[in-house]
């Protein structure tokens, strides 16, 4: 007798239709106030799901004086699940771990409201609220029916966050130009139908980042970029994640009357951003500790030469995100 392999078939046909329209306008009301608004309407249809949706966007700018500017904005957008996540098939990582597709996934929406205060065209103070109904992400579930760890992408009820951000630039002489970014965020993720469970997970998260542009020499023209960041312990759905940190750096030499340059860049120099992540799950009988170790360090060497007044044409890249 042979083994039934029907569930291993990854051949799928998926039909998807979208119809949309766009309307927008902008208006200057005197010297101090400007306003713009737009709305995109969309009809989205698959074999298992169809819906009308509207995605409005507004922005209001009030210039009290050149040194004091207020900006209030509201944006909305959508994210579609990848075609792989929409597959009916099941893939097996090991005898214990498996990845299940979910053809019932629907798009998620992102609503964002931001209030920015810009002081002296340098200092930025921001308050933001972000609400994402039907957010989808892949999470792990320990089956209560068999010995299996199931990875599956599901739509949650929502994820929301409140954040306050401060950006402070400063200079030291003519050789150092720096920016400090500080952010405090409250994040909440809620899902009432996560297999046979539910979760309502929240946490305060802090981010600190320092970006430096350093002139090492003017003759020859040698410049350095150095960025460091720290993210406090955070959450992803019902997961708890440990803190992460990273250092990015690069050196550029400009010569031949600024027409030529050689640049060396190193991102995540110590492989600390994705190379050492601890995932903890403690939710209604679900108990898991997982350590991931990805290699995220990369070093690039590039040479650039500008011929005359040549300017590179900007080409819109093809969106391949849903094929990953």
Protein language model features and the residues they cover:
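Residues that define the transmembrane beta-barrel architecture of outer-membrane proteins
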Residues: 13-19, 50-54, 107-113, 119, ...
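C-terminal beta-barrel architecture of Gram-negative outer-membrane proteins
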Residues: 208-254, 267-279, 283-287
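C-terminal beta-signal and adjacent terminal beta-strands/loops
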Residues: 255-324
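Transmembrane beta-strands of outer-membrane beta-barrel pores
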Residues: 39-47, 74-80, 90, 121, ...
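Surface-exposed extracellular loop regions of Gram-negative outer-membrane beta-barrel proteins
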Residues: 13-61, 175-186, 207-233
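Repeated loop/turn-to-beta-strand initiation elements of outer-membrane beta-barrel proteins
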Residues: 31-35, 67-70, 121-127, 174-179, ...
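Outer-membrane beta-barrel signature, preferentially recognizing the C-terminal barrel domain
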Residues: 78-127, 131-133, 149-163, 171, ...
């Amino acid at each position: 007798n042979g083994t039934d392999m029907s569930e291993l078939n990854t051949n799928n046909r998926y039909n998807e239709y979208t119809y949309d329209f766009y309307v927008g306008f902008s208006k200057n009301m005197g010297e101090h106030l400007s306003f713009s608004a737009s709305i995109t309407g969309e009809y989205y249809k698959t074999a298992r799901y169809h819906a009308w949706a509207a995605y409005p966007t507004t922005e209001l700018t009030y210039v009290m004086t050149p040194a004091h500017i207020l900006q209030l904005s509201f944006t909305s957008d959508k994210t579609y699940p990848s075609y792989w996540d929409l597959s009916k098939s099941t893939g097996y990582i090991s005898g214990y771990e498996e990845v299940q597709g979910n053809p019932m996934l629907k798009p998620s929406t992102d609503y964002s409201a931001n209030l920015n205060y810009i002081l002296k065209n340098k200092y930025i103070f921001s308050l933001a609220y972000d609400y994402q109904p039907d957010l989808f992400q892949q999470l792990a579930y320990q089956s209560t029916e068999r010995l299996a760890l199931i990875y599956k992408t599901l739509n949650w009820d929502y994820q929301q966050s409140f954040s306050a951000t401060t950006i402070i630039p400063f200079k030291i002489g003519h050789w150092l130009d720096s920016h400090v970014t500080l952010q405090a965020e409250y994040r909440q993720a809620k899902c009432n139908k996560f297999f046979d469970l539910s979760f309502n997970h929240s946490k305060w998260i802090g981010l600190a980042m320092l970006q430096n542009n350093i002139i090492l020499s003017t003759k020859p023209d040698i410049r350095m970029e150095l960025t460091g960041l720290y993210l406090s312990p955070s959450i992803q759905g019902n997961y708890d994640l440990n803190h992460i940190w990273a250092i990015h750096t690069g050196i550029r030499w400009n010569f031949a009357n600024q027409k030529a340059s050689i640049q060396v860049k190193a991102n995540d120099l110590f492989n600390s951003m994705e190379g050492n992540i601890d995932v903890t799950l403690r939710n209604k009988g679900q108990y898991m500790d997982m350590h991931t170790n990805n290699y995220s360090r990369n070093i690039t060497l590039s040479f650039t030469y500008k011929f005359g007044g040549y300017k590179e044409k900007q080409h819109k890249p093809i969106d391949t995100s849903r094929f990953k």
